Amino acid sequence: MEKIFLNGEFVSPSEAKVSYNDRGYVFGDGIYEYIRVYNGKLFTVTEHYERFLRSANEIGLDLNYSVEELIELSRKLVDMNQIETGAIYIQATRGVAERNHSFPTPEVEPAIVAYTKSYDRPYDHLENGVNGVTVEDIRWLRCDIKSLNLLGNVLAKEYAVKYNAVEAIQHRGETVTEGSSSNAYAIKDGVIYTHPINNYILNGITRIVIKKIAEDYNIPFKEETFTVDFLKNADEVIVSSTSAEVTPVIKLDGEPVNDGKVGPITRQLQEGFEKYIESHSI
């Protein structure tokens, strides 16, 4: 029987109940992580939970969990649910309290829930590429926190779906930031460009992996801003995330990226990613 982790216990889905006064439900007052499982093993799990605890710290949320404890509960959940290929979703909120914008006084216990999902890798997208659209970035100014507040992302993703695209690449003014659920990259003249780490983007774990792969393959990797026009005139465009891995974007706003085919640097990064899965899954 499927198990869900809820506030220190492994329970059945029917037992996994939270209060209508949970601050995650009322205010989106919480954080989350999404961790890939390959061959029954957790991929880059330490990096994910280090970011999880950083996000908690940034919003003043004391979880009383170490990275090691979070990894252990994740392993148990994967084993209990017999997940071979899939993911773990974990979120923490500020807990249950009467509705008030300020933090609860006295403090209440944070609420933590984690569950697993079985699903295959996006082989078709990886091999053939996807369509993308560009859209104005309307999100808040702390995108470096992996917050439950995802309405801006949801609206951007729905815009992509409306125009038969898989991802919406966002921009503030003319400056490209990131995808609605991914980091974005423009490849030009053999150089990978992506937005620098700051409050406008999430420092994606797959982004970190791609940077390391680029170093291994001696591909220049520049963390600097670029424009929508630069993106549309790139030789290759990719988006990356825990679920998307290294996905090529072959069409933007209805127009082909370069010749509309998956490029050679994208293929190198995908090759390196396969090796990284083997060496960084525990």
UniProtKB/Swiss-Prot annotation:
The residues the record assigns to binding pyridoxal 5'-phosphate are 51, 178
Q: Which residue positions are annotated as catalytic? A: 146 (proton acceptor)
Q: Enumerate the CDD domains for this protein.
A: D-AAT_like
UniProt entry keywords in alphabetical sequence: Aminotransferase, Pyridoxal phosphate, Transferase
| Entry GO terms, CC | cytosol
> One Pfam family, short name please?
Aminotran_4
List the cofactors: pyridoxal 5'-phosphate
Q: Which family does it belong to?
A: Belongs to the class-IV pyridoxal-phosphate-dependent aminotransferase family.
Top-rank taxon of the source lineage equals Bacteria
Tell me what gene encodes this. Answer: dat
Q: Which organism is it from?
A: Staphylococcus aureus (strain COL)
| Assembly with partners or alone | Homodimer.
EC number(s) for this protein?
2.6.1.21
Q: What class of enzyme is it?
A: transferase
GO biological process terms held by the UniProt record:
carboxylic acid biosynthetic process; D-amino acid metabolic process
Q: Does the keyword Transcription regulation apply?
A: no
Give the matching SUPFAM superfamilies. D-aminoacid aminotransferase-like PLP-dependent enzymes (SSF56752)
Q: What does this protein do?
A: Acts on the D-isomers of alanine, leucine, aspartate, glutamate, aminobutyrate, norvaline and asparagine. The enzyme transfers an amino group from a substrate D-amino acid to the pyridoxal phosphate cofactor to form pyridoxamine and an alpha-keto acid in the first half-reaction. The second half-reaction is the reverse of the first, transferring the amino group from the pyridoxamine to a second alpha-keto acid to form the product D-amino acid via a ping-pong mechanism. This is an important process in the formation of D-alanine and D-glutamate, which are essential bacterial cell wall components.
Name under which the protein is recorded: D-alanine aminotransferase
Provide the positions where the record notes the PTM N6-(pyridoxal phosphate)lysine: 146
Q: Where does substrate bind?
A: 32, 99, 101
An MF annotation (GO) of this entry? D-alanine-2-oxoglutarate aminotransferase activity
User: What catalytic activity is recorded?
Assistant: D-alanine + 2-oxoglutarate = D-glutamate + pyruvate
